[in-house]
């Protein structure tokens, strides 16, 4: 099982990533052990996530989400069926 996620950073930017352990990855991002991009943009809020059966599928979906425009990502976040978070 793997997850694709979008984080909303403190400065309003969006970060897209994938992981096999969503709760652990979110904690790592918020502790400054995540990606270089998110380290200086804490705190981070999990705005959107999807579950995929394999890491390969999650990576492909991540690549597709990264190509979206900001407005398209915000629309996806607004329609989030997983609003309750992790």
PLM region spans:
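GIY-YIG nuclease catalytic motif and its immediate N-terminal context
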Residues: 1-86
């Amino acid at each position: 099982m793997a997850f694709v996620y979008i984080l909303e950073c403190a400065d309003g930017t969006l970060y897209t990533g994938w992981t096999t352990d969503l709760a652990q990855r979110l904690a790592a991002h918020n502790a400054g052990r995540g990606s270089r991009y998110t380290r200086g943009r804490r705190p981070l809020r999990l705005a959107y996530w999807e579950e995929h059966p394999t890491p390969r599928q999650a990576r492909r979906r991540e690549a597709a989400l990264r190509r979206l425009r900001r407005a398209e990502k915000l629309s996806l976040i607004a329609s989030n069926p997983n609003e309750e978070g992790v």
